């Protein structure tokens, strides 16, 4: 009898399963259409789903909707009389989550009687309308799809031309066109934020081991590598201009993910019936599972990391007063490491909360952002050997509470001319303590300051469409740093020209600079009598003059080839005051220099980049990039040297394919190959190191040596299964799938009297399971 019941149960399960497999699951696709400059809602725009031959017309509120669309990937064509047509490829519908879009249309200079779609706008039309050159728009799809990306925006950017990793694979640090990673600006929701990464690497660092911002939380965002528009200040090498995704304002949805990095959860939905919404996403670290497993061959030296983070948005639209938004990003991390000789405890945290208001009138768009942030870093080191057991060798506490306000006004005179002006006010508070052990085993105080200072930025810029094929921007950015009264006026200009045969020529110039952390300015140097000075308090930010030109040729609507050349001249770079000093801030990614600095250094970067790209369509895409570049710096002795980031060349090949299985299911495979020249370094003088029992570098060969080529292959694959009201994904993202041993630095081993090689991470497989419902 039990056997018969069991057989009957199996038959029922089989019938239900076959029924589920045979269903054609559907989903809703909807969104809002707005003017690109003024954000005014656009009525009577048509949205066509190409393959399905369906059409929707936006209503008086700019909204459109398709109901019960079979789940698949679709291309959309959006058009409106008097506006340029836009084609968006690869919109993916799954049964577990609705797709809600905000589509921006750019007003045409001339109204044509008949308009045809001639370009793919989903990557070329940047989120910022004033960005005309060296900018790439991206969304969560890229960060999730690209192999080795780990759902991290910075790791994803390694696929772009001119971008390479700085060294070890355990950090998402990126080098943009040979510049130091510390020159990168992070912006979120239209305002600057501190470094949004876990396990950061010292003061001024812009990176970490794990990003606090999961790619699934992002809306369309921009990544810039040169000649940024005038509304971007305090960035020298590049800009991540990120935007959070808004929650679904009609339906409550949930997301869960379990991986070897962390446990993720998400929830979003409507607030009442007024069109308001919320979205919240959090993550709790399970990184220790990866380190303790036998999946990777890694000596962790009792390294115990933990992290957690959370981000949210609340969107509150009104009928006449615009849209009010609340948003936040919170994260903290700690590591505990104990060896036979030392105990090391590191703690870091970041909390950012923002309030946005934006409102559109007929020709005006007005946006205000108010944010408050709190960033802290703590480190405690203790000696654990001999008679000095328990002796504190270093104790630091860096705390940065900050208040920022940004206000921008955009005025669109007509379909040819738009201006924008704005102000950014930053109140930068600090509480800094840095105690280090002296040669006499006494803690010496190198930093003990608390207070606040201000950073003021003003800008104005103009966008002029000279014809339907030519547009240009011109702008000015000015800043003043009240801690030492540093000030500068930075001009910006760009030009964009399209040809009738599908070619695009773009060029731009700009002056850019970036402040150092307050701790760099206030660091103390002691004299033998115990008195101290703060010699670096009055150093100015170094300036970079960017010159860039590119030519892009469309092969078809899905494929393009782009060639871009650039020159960057850096002046007033902080360097060591000593004539034969070797320190330049261009060679550092983080940390406080112990040297006395002055603005007497120079730098120069030049390069050529090639991009060949097929946008995602028909379940297939590829991205191939190659870069040749040269990065040099000059110290007080006027001799040009390689920067440590002068890899000479870098390349990337990324390809992906999705295979449809039975109805509603698919398998995706993505492969990425990364190649670059090795970092430059100063060799160790082994003979002198042995004689002195410590590391001695041969500075007569400053940065003349180069490590072997760095290369690795990343692989990701996933299986996606759509059910009636949920979508399940199972897969793995494997970094360095071939287990390549890349040398990242060498050190002198005094015990064995030899030079040792230190390698980047081995094969790292991140297995995950994700559910959306």
Name every feature range the model reports, one short phrase each.
Residues 22-120:
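Periplasm-facing N-terminal accessory domains of Gram-negative outer-membrane beta-barrel systems
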Residues 28, 259-284, 298-334, 345-372, ...:
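Transmembrane beta-barrel wall of Gram-negative outer-membrane proteins
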Residues 92, 100, 121-228, 239, ...:
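Periplasmic N-terminal accessory/gating domains of Gram-negative outer-membrane beta-barrel systems
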Residues 192, 197, 376-378, 434-436, ...:
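Surface-exposed extracellular loop regions of Gram-negative outer-membrane beta-barrel proteins
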Residues 402-404, 446-459, 540, 560-621, ...:
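Outer membrane beta-barrel strand-and-loop segments of large Gram-negative receptors
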Residues 412-420, 424, 447-571, 625, ...:
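Structural signature of Gram-negative outer-membrane beta-barrels, strongest in the C-terminal barrel
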Residues 465, 469, 567-569, 588-679:
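Gram-negative outer-membrane beta-barrel transporters
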Residues 622, 674-694, 710-714, 718-773:
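C-terminal beta-signal and adjacent terminal beta-strands/loops
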